[in-house]
Structures are given as C-alpha cells and as structure tokens.
Amino acid sequence: MRNLKKVFSTPDDKEYFFGYYDKSPLNYKNNKILAHAVGFNDRIPDKNDFCDLGFFDLSQPDTFNKLSTTSTFNWQQGSMLQWLGPDHTQKIIFNDVDSYGKKFISKILDIDTSEEKILPFPIYSVDLLGKNAFSIDFERHYWFRRGYAYAGIKNKKKSEYFDPHDGILILNLESGSSKKIISLAELIELNRVSSMHKAAHYIEHVMPNKSGTKIAFLHRWKFETGIHARLIVSDIDGADMKIINDSGRISHFNWRNNSEIIAWGASVNPFNSMRKFSSLNKFIIKPLLPIYKKVIGRNSLQGNSKISSLISGDSYLRIDINSGKNSSFGKD
C-alpha cells in the first residue's frame, strides 16, 4: 500500500500482543502503545502463567517498558488492558487475581507514579470518561468460553448451564461499588424460544456507547444443534432492553456513534429464525442441511463461514458506509 511508514516492530525476545478490537492500544497522544508480553504462544494460558504488561514509546520503539504483571489473561482479549479515560494517557486498567488467588479483581495504575488502585471486581469494558465499567461473571465464563476466559479460578459451582443470578454488572470506578443491571433470567424471558430450554446461556462483548449512556452486548446460548447469538442494547441501568439483531449469527460489532452500531452478522430471514426452535432444528434443518450444502457447492467460502475444500487467506474490505459498495485490498 502507498504512503505507509514502518513505526516500529516488536523485539524477538517474547510474544507481544494487545487484545480485542474494541479497545485501542494507542493513548490519546498517539505516542505510546500498550502491550502484553509472554514467553509462549502454542497453548492456552493456565493458572500458573504470568504475563507482563507495559508499553512501547514510539520515540524509543525498541524498548518495552514493563509496568506490571498479571496471571489473568487470554489470547483473544488479553487482560482487558486499556487506557483509562478521560485523558486515556496517564492511567491504565487491567484484570488480575487477588493475592490469595480466590477472586478476580482489576487494577488501575498510574504509569508515571506507579500508584495503584485495586478494585474488588474484574472489568469487561470501560466508558470513555473512565467513570463506569461493565462486567460479567468470569468464573462462570470459564466453563463455556474457554478461549475468552481466565484460568486462575476454576469454580465448579459455576459450571451449571443456567445461573439466573449471572448477568451484567455496572461498576463505579471511583467508589468501587457494583450493581447488577441485567440478569440471565431477564434475558431468557426476552422473546423466549424453545431452544433456550436446557441450553448453556452466557453474555459476551459488553460495550458502552460513546457517551456512556447505553450498552450493547451479545446473549448467546449453546443448544443441541449449535449456538444462537443475538445483539441487545439497553440503557446503562438495564432499562429499555431491545433486541437489535436476532439472526443467530452476529459477532463482531462496535458503536459508530451514540445511536448507531456497525456489526458483522447475518440478516434476519426465515431460515435463521427457524434455528431458534428445537423441534424445527431437529426434524427439518438438521436433515436438510447436507442437501443445502450440496446444492450451493462445497467450494463456497464467504465471510466468516467454515472452511470446506478451499482455504482462504486474509484480505481487507473497504466499505462505503453511504453506498454499501465494497472493495478488497491488502490480500495475501
């Protein structure tokens, strides 16, 4: 691509990574990049693994400036490491486990003074002002989404498929107080369908909008024939809950502004709607699926589909928001 300039490359001594796409490793001054540093990359982290946290200063890009360590991280989202608002320059926040190894916590760290504040809960996301954070039950998440969970606490009491008390918490970063705003029990009663029965329910990707007045999140459940996901939006107190996409196939999304969301997913159609119902899945969709695959061809790969007989490399799409037209670039 034209007009690209190499800023820095990570050293070869460790494996460096950041985390999920919804958080930026860059501070607001665009001169420091946050990173995790570990000594392996060939397995899922376990409870005995530690990860260094720090940053690269772009004026001295060859040096990793270590700030802290954590044993609470995964490959997908790291330790939820991020710059803390409102300035997104002076302080960072990340997840860890307490000194007894019994409870997940989060820490706020001043990168200049090393002053540390310990909060009695882990965080999933933080609003841009650095006022409120949002969280889920990470102990329970371990049993259903291992790649997005933490290995530090293996609580078998949280392995039940359904826990009506699980849900989303709002966390006040100043006072350290927390309050449940949405429960799994409420989510199941929101347009309840038969596939929810005896399914493993969990919540992921809780994201506040730009002003911190609303959150968007995914409610997922694993049932006999697959996983159904729906995108839901609510006020930060849990009020005015609305299902935005109920196609069953919705994953990566982000707030474009305070009232618009851009997302990868499927559109709602009769076929996707049938997947929510256990009997239709068992007696209609599952028997017909092999025929459907044969008709559309085994060599068809689009978007985030499963690989059949072709392997597709990475490429990027440039999408015009107004026209919907797209073009690819940066292909392998």
Please give the residue ranges for each predicted region.
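Multi-bladed beta-propeller domains
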Residues: M1-G19, G54-Q77, I111-I123, G176-H201, ...
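Blade-loop segments of beta-propeller domains
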Residues: E15-K23, G39-F40, D46-V97, F104
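Residue-level detector of Asp-centered blade-edge/turn motifs that repeat once per structural unit
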Residues: Y28-K29, G85-H88, L128-L129, K210-S211, ...
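Hydrophobic beta-strand positions that form the internal "hydrophobic ladder"
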Residues: N30-L34, I92-I93, A133, I215, ...
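Beta-propeller blade signature
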Residues: F50-Q60, I105-D112, F162-S175, A229-G238, ...
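Asp-box/WD-like beta-propeller blade repeats and closely related beta-sheet repeat scaffolds
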Residues: T70-P86, K91-G167, K180-H197
